[in-house]
Amino acid sequence: MKFRSILAIFGDFRPKSLGIALFGAILFSLFIYLHHFGITSPLLYSLLALLALAFYLKLPRESGFAFGFWVGIAWFYWMALSFRYYELTYLIPFILLGIGGVYGVLFSMALYLKNPLVRALLLWLLSHVQPFGFDWMVPEVMLVPSLLDSSKLSFGLILLSLSLFWLLPQRWLKPLPLLLLPFTLYSKPFSPSLPPFEVEIIETHIPQEIRWEREARARIIEENLKRIDAAILEGKALILFPETAFPLLLNKEDWVLEHLAQKSQEIAIITGALRAEEGEIYNSTYFFHQGRIEVADKIVLVPFGEKIPLPDFLVKPLNRLFFGGAQDYRASASKPVDFELHGVKLRNAICYEATSAILYEGSPQFMVVGSNNAWFYPSIEPALQRLLLGYYAREHRTTILHAANRSPSGIIAP
C-alpha cells in the first residue's frame, strides 16, 4: 500500500483541507484560551459557541481527523507537561502525537457521515467517550461562560436547531429552527448558596520542582501553620488548603498531626497530603475539627498521572521503564466522602476527581476541592478545570470551594 493511500484512511491532508480543519479547531477551542486570559463576555462566548458548533456540523468529512487532532492538542497539550518532572521530557512530542491521534480518530468517526443530525447526536454523546478513563472532553463546557445553558437538554436543543438550519432547503425557513435558542438561555440562581460560616480559601504558588525538597518542605509547613494562625485571628470557621499542601506522608508525621489537631480546637482545617498504609500510597484529604481527624482518600485517579490504566501485567514493566519502579497510587474503593461542619455537609474531592460525575452523586450542596496545578504550569489547564467545575456546579446546583496551587482559588457557584 502506498504512503498516500495510508494517509487517505485518515482523510485529506492537502493544504485546503488542513486549513479548514485548523480553522474549525480554533473555533472549537478558543473559549478556553479566552477564559485563560480573563475575558468575561457572555455574549461573545455565546456567539463563538454557536459559530463553532455550526461550523462543526458542516465540516468536510475529509477534514475530520485533522480537526480532531488539533482539537485534542488545543484542549489537552498540557497533559504532556507533567512528564518534565519525571525526567521524561523527550517523550513530550510522542505524547502530543498520541493525544492528537486519539481525538483525531474519535472526531473522524463522528464526522464520517455528512448528515448534520447524525453529527449532532454523536457530538452530544461524545462526553460519554472516555479514552483510558479520561473524561475532560465535554463539548458542552463551551457554554459555561456564555448566556446559554450547558445542560445536556439545552446542548441537544442547540445542536438540533443548528442541524435543522443546515438541513432546511428553503432560505426563508432556515431562521425557524433558531427560535429554539431562547429556550436554551441559562437561568442563574438569584442568590447562590454559600456556607453559613466564614471560610479562608488558600491559594499557593509553589513550583512543583521544589515542593518535595527537604528545605522547601520545612518552609512550606511553617507557612501553612502561619496561615492557620492568621485565619484564627480573623475569626474564620474553616481554612481550606490545596492538594498535598503539606508535602509529606502526613499520617507518618505525628508532630504535624498533633499540631494541626491542636489548632483545630479553634478552627476547622481541611488540607491535602499523602497517606501511606501497608505499603500503599494514597492521595488524601485530612479534616481536622475539635481535635478529631478524618481522612478521605482520592477515589478517581488521574490516568497515566497517578495510575496507568492498563492491564496489571503491563503496569509494572512500564513503571520500571519510565518511572524508576515507582508504584501507582491507590484509590479508595469507597463512595465519595462528606465532611460535616456545624451541621453542613461538605463533599470532598481532590483535583481531577472534582470533574468526574461520580463525585456529584446526590447533588451535594457544597463541595471542597483541593488542586495542585503546578504539574501543568504554565498552561491553560486551570482554565479548563474551572470551566469543568462550573459545568458540574451548574448541573448539580453545587457550590464549589476550590483551593489551588499555582492557579486561582475561589468559590465557583452554579
UniProtKB/Swiss-Prot annotation:
Main location: membrane
PROSITE patterns: CN_HYDROLASE (PS50263)
Domain CN hydrolase: 202-414
Alphabetic keyword roster: Acyltransferase, Cell inner membrane, Cell membrane, Membrane, Transferase, Transmembrane, Transmembrane helix
GO process terms (BP): lipoprotein biosynthetic process
GO molecular function, one term: N-acyltransferase activity
UniProt gene name: lnt
Family listed: Belongs to the CN hydrolase family. Apolipoprotein N-acyltransferase subfamily.
Protein name: Apolipoprotein N-acyltransferase
